[in-house]
Regions:
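Domain-exit/linker segments immediately C-terminal to small folded modules
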Residues: 195-311
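Phenylalanine-focused residue identity feature
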Residues: 36, 42, 66, 86, ...
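Extended amphipathic secondary-structure runs
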Residues: 165-181, 220-235
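N-terminal alpha-helical interaction blocks
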Residues: 2-172, 179-183
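Short recognition patches in nucleic-acid-associated and regulatory proteins
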Residues: 166-167, 174-212
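Beta-strand elements within well-structured catalytic alpha/beta cores of enzymes
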Residues: 163, 173, 243-247
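Generic serine detector
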Residues: 16, 32, 41, 58-60, ...
């Protein structure tokens, strides 16, 4: 397919050429958005991100975060660069590069083509994707080894994603921006059909439908949500008892500040278990981070917990 026609599959009736306005939904979607913002804050001025958080509970994300930056000979979306840098921060890549498989081939040899094209960032890129999509990782097999370059192209096109009244509705965010996978594009087929590769806890399957999605066996996912979902685990705070928690609310602004405060409290050693957190007042937490709840003070705020691998 010609490149121009391919882009038309993604571009709909764009309300704004510069921003994507997102509204809170179910907690998994909300955690995906907050996790995405958390990763962006690693590479951007946090104040810029906080300006995106609106009083009506929405978040207005500037589309230029999906535009490409040059890494060696390859152009890579800035949002993906942030994720790669976040996932590899402080790691001794040399140790990983020297590791060998059963045939004696080192990781450095296996990923040489990425170093040739991207320089040192090529090593980080492969390592980061392995941390997301390899065996026993959060999104196992969602993006496979031969999909890595296609994955870059896919994220790049999020800068032109739009909403079209004709397209089908995304069953994660509710927007009319579902893109039908190309018949010969195995990556799109995996990304745009929500199943256990997106979330081992919540993804439905043809064999075991999930009640979280009204027992549907297949769910349509828009390109944006497919990318956001691979960030949801980064919104969770892990406690000493190995449980993980996320504070959910009908406002991205409230969620951003409350979960930030939760991380700060945990790092200072003031809470170690979910039980201790439940003893704290959500309003008290909000006041401590100077979040003026205003009309939101009666909102339905909930604490989502994950223990022993289950929510």
């Amino acid at each position: 397919m010609a490149k121009g026609l391919d882009l038309l599959r993604w571009r709909g009736d764009i309300v704004s050429n510069n921003v994507l306005v997102l509204y809170p939904g179910n907690w998994l979607y909300n955690a995906s958005v907050i996790g995405f913002l958390e990763i962006l804050s690693f590479g951007m001025d946090k104040r810029r991100i906080e300006e995106w958080l609106k009083e009506d509970g929405s978040v207005s994300i500037e589309k230029d975060i999906f535009k490409n930056v040059k890494k060696g000979k390859v152009e890579i979306p800035y949002a993906l660069v942030c994720y790669v840098e976040f996932l590899t921060e402080g790691e001794d890549l040399q140790e990983w590069l020297e590791q060998k498989d059963k045939k004696g081939k080192s990781n450095k040899e296996k990923v040489k083509e990425y170093y040739d094209d991207m320089g040192e960032f090529g090593y980080k890129f492969v390592r980061a994707l392995n941390k997301l999509f390899s065996s026993n990782m959060p999104y196992q097999n969602l993006v496979q080894q031969n999909d890595r370059r296609k994955f870059i192209e896919y994220v790049s096109k999020l800068s032109i994603i739009g909403e079209d009244r004709i397209n089908k509705r995304c069953e994660i965010c509710g927007a009319n921006r579902v893109v039908e996978p190309e018949n010969d594009n195995s990556l799109e087929k995996r990304l745009f059909r929500f199943d256990k590769m997106h979330s081992s806890d919540f993804g439905p399957s043809m064999v075991v439908p999930n009640s979280f999605w009204n027992y549907n066996t297949s769910l349509l996912v828009c390109p944006l949500c497919a990318y956001l979902i691979i960030h949801h685990h980064k919104a969770l705070t892990r406690l000493e008892d190995n449980s993980e928690i996320f504070i959910n609310a009908p406002s991205f602004k409230v969620m951003w500040y409350l979960n930030k405060y939760l991380q700060t409290v945990y790092e200072k050693g003031k809470i170690a278990t979910t039980k201790e957190l439940l003893g704290m007042s959500i309003i008290e937490m909000a006041l401590k981070v100077n979040v003026q709840l205003g009309k939101w003070n009666m909102m339905n705020i909930e604490i989502v917990t994950k223990s022993n691998g289950r929510f």
